[in-house]
């Protein structure tokens, strides 16, 4: 294996100035504008000097359903969340997003990126809920790209021929406990490991950096 010493392996160079943040949202339905957001977790990422993507920090919040939101019985039965259980320690959408956006902006600045980009499994769902919640609480200087995402379901379908998170993780060599599935924190962590493996596997196979055959090679350190 080789690395290319003349390549800029900073994360901002790898993703065109975007900073990837892995997110999972659990909700009380599928309609982002009307159904309650119940739980959210994020995992930030970092890239080492050789260009390998790794997990960094994490945040996790249970969310109080916003006023007037719809809670669909079949959805909470599926994710096993009792929205009104006081032991959840739930906070408002505004409180959760304020802390999440603060951390993401910090990571964007540290890594000299321009904007955050959401990474999720079936990313359209999580992106819609995040943007709807951000709008409800007055945006709070939302650091995420308004429409571009990285979808690990699509990427896993390409690389592994599987779009189900548990099956993709298994093929990637990542443990997956189905008893913990649909916990926002657990799913976010496993999705983060999966995304890192997808990115790193592409690098191991020679797909990154692109068009690098002309570059000066040196033994990997």
UniProtKB/Swiss-Prot annotation:
Active site: 182 (proton donor/acceptor)
Cofactor note: Binds two Mg(2+) per subunit. The active form of the enzyme binds two Mg(2+) ions in its active site. The first Mg(2+) forms only one salt bridge with the protein.
GO CC term, one of those recorded: cytosol
Residues in Exonuclease domain copies: 21-195
Residues that bind Mg(2+) 1: 24
SUPFAM superfamilies documented for this protein: Ribonuclease H-like
KW Phosphoprotein (keyword) present: no
Keyword Transferase set for record: no
Function: Trims short 3' overhangs of a variety of RNA species, leaving a one or two nucleotide 3' overhang. Responsible for the end-turnover of tRNA: specifically removes the terminal AMP residue from uncharged tRNA (tRNA-C-C-A). Also appears to be involved in tRNA biosynthesis.
Entry protein name: Ribonuclease T
